[in-house]
Structure formats: C-alpha cells, structure tokens
Amino acid sequence: MADLLSSLKNLPNSSGVYQYFDKNRQLLYIGKAKNLKKRIKSYFSICNNEITPNHRASLRIQMMVKQIAFLETILVENEQDALILENSLIKQLKPKYNILLRDDKTYPYIYMDFSTDFPIPLITRKILKQPGVKYFGPFTSGAKDILDSLYELLPLVQKKNCIKDKKACMFYQIERCKAPCEDKITKEEYLKIAKECLEMIENKDRLIKELELKMERLSSNLRFEEALIYRDRIAKIQKIAPFTCMDLAKLYDLDIFAFYGASNKAVLVKMFMRGGKIISSAFEKIHSLNGFDTDEAMKQAIINHYQSHLPLIPEQILLNACSNEALKELQEFISHQYSKKIALSIPKKGDKLALIEIAMKNAQEIFSQEKTSNEDLILEEVRSLFNLECVPYRVEIFDTSHHANSQCVGGMVVYENNEFQKDSYRRYHLKGSNEYAQMSELLTRRALDFAKEPPPNLWVIDGGRAQLNIALEILKSSGSFVEVIAISKEKRDSKAYRSKGGAKDIIHTPSDTFKLLPSDKRLQWVQKLRDESHRYAINFHRSTKLKNMKQIALLKEKGIGEASVKKLLDYFGSFEAIEKASEQEKNAVLKKRI
C-alpha cells in the first residue's frame, strides 16, 4: 500500500486517463478525468496513512477499491482526448471492472449519386462528401436484401462500371436493364426509374407490396423455388424496422439509446428515426461479473457509434438515463467530432419520452427472453471447475495446421451466445518452423488486433501446457485480461471416436490439469469448441495446399521445375509475389544460390 499512498500524494491536476491494478498487477479499471487529482482521490478515504474506500461510492466501486494496490496515469491535452483514449484502452485491455460493449461497427447506408447521368443504389459505410448524393439509413440489417430487390424489380443499370463498356450485356437481354450504354434510353427516361427507386427505399411498404406481387406471379407459374426466395427476402425486409407503424407528425431525425440491466446481464437497444419513422433498430446483450454502471455503458455506446464520421447525423440523441456530468461530456464529444451542436437529452414528456419508453420496453422484453439455458449452466460449471474469474460468454479458440512445416496456417473460431459466430472467424498464413512457433505467431497477431477487435473472456488453445504457457506470456505482454485453457488431444485421435464422447482428452489451466470422464458435459463443451477450430484450420490448410498445387502446375507449364519453384518461394515469399515479379527478377533469383 506504500506505493499506492505515494501515488495518491503526487497526483497531477491535469486531464488524463487513470488505471487501477491489484497486487498481482492485474488491471482492474480504466477511467478518465478532467482533473486526475480530484477524480482519483474521490475513490478513497485516507486517515493516518490508512487507505479505505470512500463510503459514498457504490458497493461495486468499494469492492474494487479494496483490491487496488497500484495506479498509473496517462496525461493528455484535454478532456476530449481523455474520453477517446479511455474508450480505446477499455476495448483493448478489457479491465475486470469496466463494461465492454463490443458492437462498435459502422452500420451501412444505401445511397444514390444523382450527380451521375445514370444513378444506381449502392451500399456504403463511408462518406462521399459531394453534392447530389442522397443517403438512406443506417440499416442495422437487411440493406443488401433491399438492394437486391431494387435491382430485380426495376430496370436499373446493374453494375457501377456498365456504362463505360458501351455495349449491352445479358441484363438487357433478360429485360433487367434498359442499356443506356448503347443509348437505348435517354437520361430523362432513366431518371424516372431512379426516382421510382428512391420512393421504394423511402417507403418499404411499397417495396414489400411489389415483392409480394412478384412472388405470387412466380408461384402461379409453378416456379416455387424462386417464389420461396422472395418470401424469405420479404420476411427479412419486414424485420428491418419492426416499429415502422410509429409515424410521428413531426419529421424528427433521432437516434435513441436505451439501457436496461439487472444482476450480471444487460441489454442496450438502439433505434434510428429518420423523417418521423423508425427505419432500423439493433440491440446488444452485455454480461458483467461485477454489475453495471449506466454512465459507463452510455459513454461507450455513444463513442463507439459516433467516433467514425457518419453521413447522416440526427438532430438529437435521446438516452433513457445518464448523469448530468456524463451527458455534458458526451455533448462536448459529439459537438467536437462533427463541428456542430447535436443535442443529447433524457426526455421527460411528450413524443420523445414515448420513444424512449418503447425502446426501454423492447430492452426489457429482450432481457426477459434471456432465460437460463442448459448451456448457461454448463458455462457456470466450466467457470467453477477451471477456477475462471469470468463466465466465458465469449470464447476464441485457436488451432494451427501444416504439412511437414509447409503451407502453415492458423485459424481462430469464436463462440458467443451459445453458438459459433462465423462472421468473426479469422484465418492466418503462418511462417513458424514448428508448431510452437506457429502458435506463438498466431496468438501474437490476434493480440495485436485487440484495439480493433476487443479480447474475449476466454482463449481455448488446441495444444498442451507448452502452448498454454505461450498464450499466457503473450497476454501478459499485451496487458489485456484474458483467461486461458488448453486441451491436448489424446494419441488415439479418431474423429468418430471423439464425436461419440469417447475421447479422454486432457485440459490444462495455469494452475492445474484435468482428466475428466468422457461423459462429462464440461469436457464435451471444450471438445466441441476444439473440434470446430480443428475443422476450420484443416479446411483452410487444404484449400491453401490445393491453391499452391495449382500455382506449381502453372509454373511447371512455363518450364519452371519444383526445385526452382522452391527457390522462388524462398526469395519472394508467396505465389502472388512471384506472379508480380518481372521475368528479369525471376531469372536473377534462379541463377543465384538462396
């Protein structure tokens, strides 16, 4: 405690970020302050050099303060910089007592550029700062379904570069395009089609009606498979904005955030209103071992959503709850980010309060549907058995694959909300000369991405204690809090044998080794994760090997033998680099010893 007491007596009166650590140097909490000295001292009571938690703080904060042994500060120019740095460090390091919101993606917009002669609808996540561009969104889902429907219902130019070809393509032959590339339609006539496209984007009821008519025509012509495609697409588009029946007389442009939580679970709902209509909505389920702080959740939600410049900014942002201090901070952040004043408020009456109540009702409904399942019980049992600090709600699983240390690859699969999240899977080409070097490279590359893709609760490594120690060392150097276990396959490595629960695999934790019965549900849960990562890595290895074989065959056709191929690969590093190299460069390599 002497170190902590010394730090508390020498705090700066500057803006910055502070970090609390326990006696083992595990990161507990990250916060920011306009005045570090005032903010940090508010956590503690000091009497006769004895440090105790401030009794006015919440029980969650008091519990954390009892564990603080060290603190560090990072000074910045102003409070805005501190706010952004705090959010970035929380995502990267995942402290024990901070809430982590993972949904920081930029939602797509549909846009049409009317400065061109023949505008078409396209999807973007970037801003095109030019006149004549009209945006619609954001769409939390279904943007591609809308786009596909527009291109099928209307004779639009089907591809961005079609006009340059100056020749009608098959879309003209099947009556899906009017061939402006061959001047078969005037700009004025095409503009009428483009405006009809705009109307369908703005009025999804009309779009759905047109899709239903087409589905009925296909069905009456016994083209049932195509009709089913339209049925499924209609269902997806209908789900885009479940609140579209709420049309307000005032044409508000609003973003609405509602946070509801209890115990160790919470839900954040986001709704987007444009022109008085809710056009899309999204929600995120959040878990925390140490309870929730609404201010912290709202700050992360707002910063994550608005940190990237968005093409359509609302007139106002509505929140269901937030302290005056946090509201002021966020107001300054938004105004600074977009160089204009955008009001943040907590409505107390009228239409806007009704919108918040609807968002809260949806958050509560989603929360109540989160019933405890058998999988949740297994997660609790896994946490207890392996002595994990956190329930492993989000898990990343790693495996490598190679053939005689060639075509070395690695795979990461992700498991969350009781299912594999295939959109989050990642593949890696590796250079390591053995399985330990390959695993080290794989895990290091993942850890370096923590700032972009926040770390999970748990890493599961396909390997033994050596691989486990590699993972622990990498995480220690990254400063991030992620727990790790490893599972080593038994020598009798039959997939059929394992799938029946017969494997006697060994699970390693930092402090223990477990040999569980084949029927143990906790073992089977870990095996399920390991087997998916193994499948993913093996499939990537096979596709890489097949691609390389094709490349070798092509080089052989050009008169380059296997020994020469190896020399070229050793020098250039990949087949892609060989293809880009000039004949002179390749000849120079083949004449020198590598």
Swiss-Prot record:
Q: Does the keyword Cell membrane apply?
A: no
Q: Which GO BP annotation is one of this protein's?
A: SOS response
Q: Where is the GIY-YIG domain?
A: 13-99
List, for all copies, the residue spans of the domain called UVR. Answer: 205-240
**Localization in the cell:** Cytoplasm
Question: Per the annotation, which location comes first and is thus the protein's main one?
Answer: cytoplasm
Q: Does the record carry Cytoplasm as a key word?
A: yes
Keywords tagged on the record: Cytoplasm, DNA damage, DNA excision, DNA repair, Excision nuclease, SOS response
Q: Gene3D superfamilies in the record, alphabetically?
A: 5' to 3' exonuclease, C-terminal subdomain, GIY-YIG endonuclease, UVR domain, UvrC, RNAse H endonuclease domain
- InterPro entries found in the cross-reference section: GIY-YIG_endonuc (IPR000305), GIY-YIG_endonuc_sf (IPR035901), GIY-YIG_UvrC_Cho (IPR047296), RuvA_2-like (IPR010994), UVR_dom (IPR001943), UVR_dom_sf (IPR036876), UvrABC_protein_C (IPR050066), UvrC (IPR004791)
GO cellular component: a single term: cytoplasm
**A single GO molecular function, which one?**
DNA binding
This chain's function reads: The UvrABC repair system catalyzes the recognition and processing of DNA lesions. UvrC both incises the 5' and 3' sides of the lesion. The N-terminal half is responsible for the 3' incision and the C-terminal half is responsible for the 5' incision.
Question: What does the similarity note say?
Answer: Belongs to the UvrC family.
Q: Which PANTHER family match?
A: UVRABC SYSTEM PROTEIN C, UVRC/OXIDOREDUCTASE
Subunit structure as annotated in this protein's UniProt entry: Interacts with UvrB in an incision complex.
Q: Name the chain's protein.
A: UvrABC system protein C
